[in-house]
Amino acid sequence: DHPTPVIDLARVFSDTQRGRLEESLDEVEERTGWKLRVLTQYERTPGLAIREFWGLDERSLLLVADPRGGNLLNFNVGDAYFAMMPRTYWVELQTRFGNQYYVKDHGEDGAVLDALGAVEICLERGRCQVVPGLPLEQWLWTLTTSVLGGLIAGFAAYPRKEGETVAWAWLLLLSP
């Protein structure tokens, strides 16, 4: 009934969330010139009519949230986006925020909002090769493996012969 960047057929968002999201997406479009649109669907889907309704072009991104598949998020990406964010970015974005574990922990609304937030960060920066932000689990895993690797290297490098400062042979043998 009014021009909107959000069509919430699946009722993923509360009225307040939808209103804030509409304002945010309109503001991003005014500020950057890039169109971001959100469609949530379940049983009912507008199909290809949505392209004409929103006038999607090469500077448009359509995020489709549909829980019927294995991944909540799908993206219809305008060609101009690929100059700033490669195809691998969109795959990473989909797998990070649309997987069933993330959706279970953050809800469908959180997954959509977080994915859009990552895109907005990249639009502000002007370019992204990878999705910004590091999940806590990945950060902890990286820290743990780094510390463990340091301990192994330290023990391996400990001199075994008198006059030797570093046991290079053992260090190289046990290094990854």
Annotate each PLM feature:
Residues D1-G149:
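Folded, non-transmembrane soluble domains that reside on the lumenal/extracytoplasmic side of membranes
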Residues L148-S175:
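Juxtamembrane interface at the cytosolic side of transmembrane helices
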